[in-house]
Amino acid sequence: MRVSLLTNGPGELWGWVRPVAMELRRRGHSVSLWLLPCPFASGHEREAASLLGVDKLEGPSGGPGLWRAMADERTDCVIQLGGDMLFGARIARSARAPLLCYTYGPKKGLKGARVFTAFPSQARAIPGARAIGDLVKDALLLDAAQSPERGCPTLPHGTAGRDWSRPGGGGRVLFLPGSRPPIRRAALPWLAAARAALRARLPEAEVRTLFPPFVPEAELREWDDAGLRPVRAPAGLVMRDADFALTQPGTNNFELMHCGVPSLVVAPESFLDLIPIAGLRGVLASLPLVGRGLRRAAARRILNRWNGVIALPNRLTDRRVMDELYGDVTPEQTASRMAEDLSDAEGLARAREELLALSGQGGAAARLCDAIPAEDGSA
């Protein structure tokens, strides 16, 4: 059977597509992967996708050429794993193939697709969706079993390995600056200041900074020079060694949840101009006079939709299982909150238990592949 996968951003590619592609290959299916246009792209998606062993790789590209190429795709099933549903519908309609979609929340274009999501609370917010577990958890399990012999892609590692020591009470703290180069560039001095302020409060605290697989060595050296000890290794291996994490809203919130890592999720207002916005709103937000106001309005809409909650695991429950800060937040305020959290041993233990309780079972990729209609029309 031929299966076409569509995705856009770096989190979806490595956290969703990877386990699904591995499972499809294990079942003997032919897999084509389309990398869609994405304002959130890191620039290294094609390099990462080349490790997945798919039979056909297209993109990232846009414009009329992409649209025409999709009309020529011959496939038995389309699975959309991120991106505008317009693209998945295009291939499904041209190939007369069923369209499946995996998403964390409601989005335009789901009508006509079979929709799957990770958690029951998400399914309740998406009409007709079925909760099958989190693909990100399957990706972390791939990290733990990573080897070419087992069909899992091997990643390049950075110069600074996972050389945690056992500090005398300060804790092992993992910084996650994200996959988008503009945000990482702005985050370097900000996180360096946060590390210095944290060490002033907890001298024994040991900081490492986790990077996506294909961050250039030159950039890693900049972070190492700033004392932030970069680590370029599978998230599923590094996160399990951490006592605490500092991150931003995004897919890695769920990675940390599955690994049971207590975390502080921070969204400083000073980074607002660096956050990409998709579609026409993104074009308008880039205008010099009105752009910042539009970004602030977009941020307010998101906060209002989730009652002011920014950490993804906190949106699954009425409890604050991850600490969070947003608004006019400074590195010093962030360090102070981290020091408070790290000094509360009972609170950390409780957070680990609550995060792991939310995690659920693995196997989402297998369940999604089980839902692919057979060639005789059965599922």
For every predicted segment, state its role.
Residues 1-379:
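Nucleotide-activated sugar donor-binding and catalytic core shared by glycosyltransferases
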